[in-house]
Swiss-Prot record:
Signal peptide (residue range): 1-26
Assembly and oligomerization: Interacts (via N-terminus) with gM (via N-terminus). The gM-gN heterodimer forms the gCII complex.
Protein name listed in UniProt: Envelope glycoprotein N
Similarity section: Belongs to the herpesviridae glycoprotein N family.
Keyword Transmembrane helix belongs to the record: yes
Compartments (UniProt record): Virion membrane; Host membrane; Host Golgi apparatus, Host trans-Golgi network
Matches recorded under HAMAP family: HSV_GN (MF_04037)
Residue numbers on the Virion surface membrane side: 27-45
Function as written in the Swiss-Prot or TrEMBL entry: Envelope glycoprotein necessary for proper maturation of gM and modulation of its membrane fusion activity. Also plays a critical role in virion morphogenesis.
Bilayer topology: Single-pass type I membrane protein
Short name of one Pfam family: Herpes_UL73
Length: 84
């Protein structure tokens, strides 16, 4: 019984989240109108999600740079030592 109850609760939560997402997206009716084009839609950079995206992008680029610095140094050092 508990498995069915847990599955039913997960289904209700999923349906609730779907309902919230659909009606939250439906409030932005100007986005779906025929006058709105992707190249004219205004990007908002002061929302939480855009700030979070920029922070994640910065961290990703920093980690990529650190990895490349380590990898290039490791390759350079092994190639240099190989000649001796």
């Amino acid at each position: 019984m508990s498995c069915k109850k847990g599955a039913r609760q997960r289904l209700y939560v999923s349906l609730w989240l779907f309902y919230i997402l659909v009606f939250a997206a439906a409030t932005e009716m100007d986005f779906y109108s025929s006058e709105c084009h992707s190249h004219t839609y205004e990007i908002v950079l002061n929302s939480f999600s855009s700030i979070w995206l920029l922070i994640n992008l910065f961290l990703l680029l920093c980690s990529f740079a650190i990895f490349l610095k380590y990898w290039c140094y490791k390759t350079f050092a092994s190639e240099t030592v190989k000649g001796y």
